[in-house]
């Protein structure tokens, strides 16, 4: 029951913190120039948190259990070993197992990131092909970008929720707090970046609030579903394959796709078009 109470409180704090961080751009009236600056800031926060927070935290969560296990094995070996030759033999065995585990973890890192990126690529392609089948593809393209950006961040937040639910299933408070802090460190900038991007794209404020609410609800809902849906055997199996780290790296792949493929190119293209269009009316003599 303590685990359920803790995951409930963490989910509630995640929901409130994410929504409050995302509502800040809506609560302040920005001019057009300041809105561009806020949008660029949001895009920078998305890319920066993807590279500087999510990927390192996912790798740390992936390696943490193995490193703790090796530490316990080393302490037990020091207590139980009597002869020096036996100690040397056991250290060689531990070193071999350590290198074997590291090669497996390296594979987990790359595969999880690539799967997250490719998953969002497929979602993007399916969504864009569906939108381009409408009557006006030119006007449909910006709306597709808005929907894909929100959908990508919602998928990323859902993967974060799975990571938190898997961490809560381990019954280790320290692991839960580490994962929660890591998620909040990038969910708040992500909410800010999402809202600023949608404002810059011209979406109505009521619809922006709905997008923000869906994004804020995704991680808490998935964390509760993951925690409640896991059986005891499933929890043991997830702890063996480091599901927390794998889920965080998968979410990092989805986050990287949204930040680098949609938000950042959209901002740079609009800024370049605005700067290139401003001096052009001067040399032209046509009215």
UniProtKB/Swiss-Prot annotation:
<feature type="glycosylation site" description="N-linked (GlcNAc...) asparagine">
    <location>
        <position position="242"/>
    </location>
</feature>
<dbReference type="Pfam" id="PF02535">
    <property type="entry name" value="Zip"/>
</dbReference>
<keyword id="KW-0812">Transmembrane</keyword>
<dbReference type="GO" id="GO:0048471">
    <property type="term" value="C:perinuclear region of cytoplasm"/>
</dbReference>
<dbReference type="GO" id="GO:0005634">
    <property type="term" value="C:nucleus"/>
</dbReference>
<dbReference type="GO" id="GO:1905562">
    <property type="term" value="P:regulation of vascular endothelial cell proliferation"/>
</dbReference>
<dbReference type="GO" id="GO:0005886">
    <property type="term" value="C:plasma membrane"/>
</dbReference>
<keyword id="KW-0406">Ion transport</keyword>
<feature type="transmembrane region" description="Helical">
    <location>
        <begin position="177"/>
        <end position="197"/>
    </location>
</feature>
<keyword id="KW-0539">Nucleus</keyword>
<dbReference type="GO" id="GO:0004930">
    <property type="term" value="F:G protein-coupled receptor activity"/>
</dbReference>
<feature type="transmembrane region" description="Helical">
    <location>
        <begin position="4"/>
        <end position="24"/>
    </location>
</feature>
<dbReference type="GO" id="GO:0005739">
    <property type="term" value="C:mitochondrion"/>
</dbReference>
<comment type="similarity">
    <text>Belongs to the ZIP transporter (TC 2.A.5) family.</text>
</comment>
<feature type="compositionally biased region" description="Low complexity">
    <location>
        <begin position="273"/>
        <end position="287"/>
    </location>
</feature>
<keyword id="KW-0496">Mitochondrion</keyword>
<dbReference type="InterPro" id="IPR045891">
    <property type="entry name" value="ZIP9"/>
</dbReference>
<keyword id="KW-0813">Transport</keyword>
<protein>
    <recommendedName>
        <fullName>Zinc transporter ZIP9</fullName>
    </recommendedName>
</protein>
<dbReference type="GO" id="GO:0005385">
    <property type="term" value="F:zinc ion transmembrane transporter activity"/>
</dbReference>
<keyword id="KW-0862">Zinc</keyword>
<dbReference type="GO" id="GO:2000654">
    <property type="term" value="P:regulation of cellular response to testosterone stimulus"/>
</dbReference>
<feature type="region of interest" description="Disordered">
    <location>
        <begin position="268"/>
        <end position="287"/>
    </location>
</feature>
<dbReference type="GO" id="GO:0031966">
    <property type="term" value="C:mitochondrial membrane"/>
</dbReference>
<keyword id="KW-0963">Cytoplasm</keyword>
<dbReference type="InterPro" id="IPR003689">
    <property type="entry name" value="ZIP"/>
</dbReference>
<dbReference type="GO" id="GO:0006882">
    <property type="term" value="P:intracellular zinc ion homeostasis"/>
</dbReference>
<feature type="transmembrane region" description="Helical">
    <location>
        <begin position="35"/>
        <end position="55"/>
    </location>
</feature>
<feature type="glycosylation site" description="N-linked (GlcNAc...) asparagine">
    <location>
        <position position="29"/>
    </location>
</feature>
<dbReference type="GO" id="GO:0005497">
    <property type="term" value="F:androgen binding"/>
</dbReference>
<comment type="function">
    <text>Transports zinc ions across cell and organelle membranes into the cytoplasm and regulates intracellular zinc homeostasis. Participates in the zinc ions efflux out of the secretory compartments. Regulates intracellular zinc level, resulting in the enhancement of AKT1 and MAPK3/MAPK1 (Erk1/2) phosphorylation in response to the BCR activation. Also functions as a membrane androgen receptor that mediates, through a G protein, the non-classical androgen signaling pathway, characterized by the activation of MAPK3/MAPK1 (Erk1/2) and transcription factors CREB1 or ATF1.</text>
</comment>
<keyword id="KW-1133">Transmembrane helix</keyword>
<keyword id="KW-0472">Membrane</keyword>
<keyword id="KW-1003">Cell membrane</keyword>
<keyword id="KW-0864">Zinc transport</keyword>
<dbReference type="GO" id="GO:0071577">
    <property type="term" value="P:zinc ion transmembrane transport"/>
</dbReference>
<feature type="transmembrane region" description="Helical">
    <location>
        <begin position="211"/>
        <end position="231"/>
    </location>
</feature>
<feature type="glycosylation site" description="N-linked (GlcNAc...) asparagine">
    <location>
        <position position="271"/>
    </location>
</feature>
<dbReference type="GO" id="GO:0070830">
    <property type="term" value="P:bicellular tight junction assembly"/>
</dbReference>
<feature type="transmembrane region" description="Helical">
    <location>
        <begin position="147"/>
        <end position="167"/>
    </location>
</feature>
<dbReference type="GO" id="GO:0005802">
    <property type="term" value="C:trans-Golgi network"/>
</dbReference>
<feature type="transmembrane region" description="Helical">
    <location>
        <begin position="107"/>
        <end position="127"/>
    </location>
</feature>
């Amino acid at each position: 029951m303590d685990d359920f109470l803790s995951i409930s409180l963490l989910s509630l704090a995640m929901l409130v913190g994410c929504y409050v961080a995302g509502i800040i751009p809506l609560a302040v009236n920005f001019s057009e120039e300041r809105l561009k600056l806020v949008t660029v800031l949001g895009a920078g926060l998305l890319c920066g948190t993807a590279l500087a927070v999510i990927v390192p935290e996912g790798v740390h969560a992936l390696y943490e259990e193995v490193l703790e296990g090796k530490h316990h094995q080393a302490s037990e070996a020091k207590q139980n070993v009597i002869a020096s030759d036996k100690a040397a033999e056991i250290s060689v065995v531990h070193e071999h197992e350590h290198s074997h585990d590291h090669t497996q973890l390296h594979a987990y890192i790359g595969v999880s990131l690539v799967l997250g990126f490719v998953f969002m690529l497929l979602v993007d392609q399916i969504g864009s092909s569906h939108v381009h089948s409408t009557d006006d593809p030119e006007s449909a393209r910006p709306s597709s970008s808005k929907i894909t950006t929100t959908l990508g961040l919602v998928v990323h937040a859902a993967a974060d929720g799975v990571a938190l639910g898997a961490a809560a299933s381990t019954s280790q408070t320290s692991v839960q707090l580490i994962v929660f802090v890591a998620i909040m460190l990038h969910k708040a900038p992500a909410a800010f970046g999402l809202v600023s991007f949608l404002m810059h794209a011209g979406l109505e404020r009521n619809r922006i609030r709905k997008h923000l609410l869906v994004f804020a609800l995704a991680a808490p809902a998935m964390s509760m579903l993951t925690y409640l849906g896991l059986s005891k055997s499933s929890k043991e199996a997830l702890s063996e394959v480091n599901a927390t780290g794998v889920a965080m790296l998968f979410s990092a792949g989805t986050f990287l796709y949204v930040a680098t493929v949609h938000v950042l190119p959209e901002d740079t293209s609009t800024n370049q078009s605005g700067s290139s269009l401003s001096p052009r009316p001067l040399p032209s003599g046509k009215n």
